From Swiss-Prot:
Transmembrane segments: none annotated. Its EC number is 7.1.1.-. The lineage of its organism: Eukaryota, Viridiplantae, Streptophyta, Embryophyta, Tracheophyta. It is a peripheral membrane protein. This is NAD(P)H-quinone oxidoreductase subunit H, chloroplastic. The gene is ndhH.
């Protein structure tokens, strides 16, 4: 018996929310026509913790332990932007040695973030081996962090006017040894992945973003540079002491998932170049600006009040934010990480707006996956590189 062909029913599929160790608790409601994606709706908010409101009820020093929970795989950057804003508001000079230490820590954190992007990205498209390889190198980075800060993650190392502690004896030599070893590791990754025909089949020409389109969507970081736009805030804004080092902006013009992979792999090599130059040229001197203490509010406790009775308590620094507004930004591993800060002549910010790169970059996902195959969703989502801690805040 012959039946007339009728229009197929569309199928709605839920993807996620997954465990935070992968891309995080992101839920995608995907509408399918067979294997083809018709529509995709991201559902956010599963990891929302009210980070902006918490900032309005804490001093900057009290808030520092919270910020490491935004992007919990690149915590040095969230700490850096948290102290950079008040430093610019108060016109506080950072000692040269502290600036060099900051650059070293930021670039090590960039390498660790890119490594933990590479492993799950390869696992998403079916390659399990690199997922285990990247932990080998990442463990060495975390050993360096632990030796310098006491913590493998959530370091709480940056301070207004410098860093919390100087580098321990022998740390610079240990870091130089890591740089030499890691360059051979990147060569191994490129042999294993970059020219792999199965890998190229999965990523080449998938999720293409043009240069003008990337600018219109407000993309930043490797997402923008993979579309042919040479834009890196380390070169544009001249923050810390990046101008003193010889390095190049890494970019590609194809705009597909392969281009985003190549940009991040190349950025790790550039980070090693920056770290090596910083280690060889790091000056002596103080690691913090002691003049920051003059910003502390004078205490004149009355008899029988809390501060008088508990005279032995260690006071928290009360850096007062002047009545101004400021937007501070920096080049995080995932893109432009910024804060919009409004001071109100008190120790607490009146407004603390976070501009997370992952949240902005994620907005283009529904457009990229339309008319693609279902299996390509994980390739495109993985190439964007999101952490839901900073997306939901």
């Amino acid at each position: 018996m012959n039946l007339s062909a009728t229009e197929k029913d569309l199928m709605i599929v839920n993807m996620g929310p997954h465990h935070p160790s992968m891309h995080g608790v992101l839920r995608l409601i995907v509408t399918l026509d067979g294997e083809d994606v018709v529509d995709c709706e991201p559902i956010l908010g599963y990891l929302h913790r009210g980070m902006e409101k918490i900032a309005e009820n804490r001093t900057i020093i009290q808030y520092l332990p919270y910020v490491t929970r935004w992007d919990y795989l690149a915590t040095m950057f969230t700490e850096a932007i948290t102290v950079n804003g008040p430093e610019q508001l108060g016109n506080i000079q950072v000692p040269k040695r502290a600036s060099y230490i900051r650059v070293i820590m930021l670039e090590l954190s960039r390498i660790a973030s890119h490594l933990l992007w590479l492993g799950p990205f390869m696992a998403d498209i079916g390659a399990q081996t690199p997922f285990f390889y990247i932990f080998r190198e990442r463990e060495l980075v975390y050993d360096l962090f632990e030796a310098a800060t006491g913590m493998r993650m959530m370091h709480n190392y940056f301070r207004i006017g410098g860093v919390a502690a100087d580098l321990p004896y022998g740390w610079l030599d240990k870091c130089l040894d890591f740089c030499d070893y890691f360059l051979t590791g990147i060569v191994e990754y490129q042999k294993l992945i970059t020219r792999n025909p199965i890998f190229l089949e999965r990523v080449e020409g998938i999720g293409v973003i043009g240069g003008e389109e990337a600018i219109n969507w407000g993309l930043s970081g490797p997402m923008l540079r993979a579309s042919g736009i040479k834009w890196d805030l380390r070169k544009v804004d001249h923050y810390e002491c990046y101008d003193e080092f010889d390095w190049e902006i890494q970019w590609q013009k194809e705009g597909d998932s392969l281009a985003r992979y190549l940009v991040r792999i190349s950025e790790m090599t550039e980070s090693i170049k920056i770290i090596q130059q910083a280690l060889e040229g790091i000056p002596g001197g103080p690691y913090e600006n002691l003049e920051i203490r003059c910003f502390d509010r004078e205490r004149d406790p009355e008899w029988n009040d809390f501060e008088y009775r508990f005279i032995s308590i260690k006071p928290s620094p009360t850096f007062e934010l002047p009545r101004q507004e400021l937007y501070a930004r920096m080049e995080a591993p995932k893109g432009e990480l910024g804060i919009f800060l409004i001071g109100d002549q008190s120790g607490f910010p009146w407004r603390w707006k976070i501009r997370p790169p992952g949240f902005i970059n994620l907005q283009i996902l529904p457009q990229l996956v339309k008319r693609m195959k279902l299996a390509d969703i994980m390739t495109i989502l993985g190439s964007i590189d999101i952490i839901m801690g900073e997306v939901d805040r």
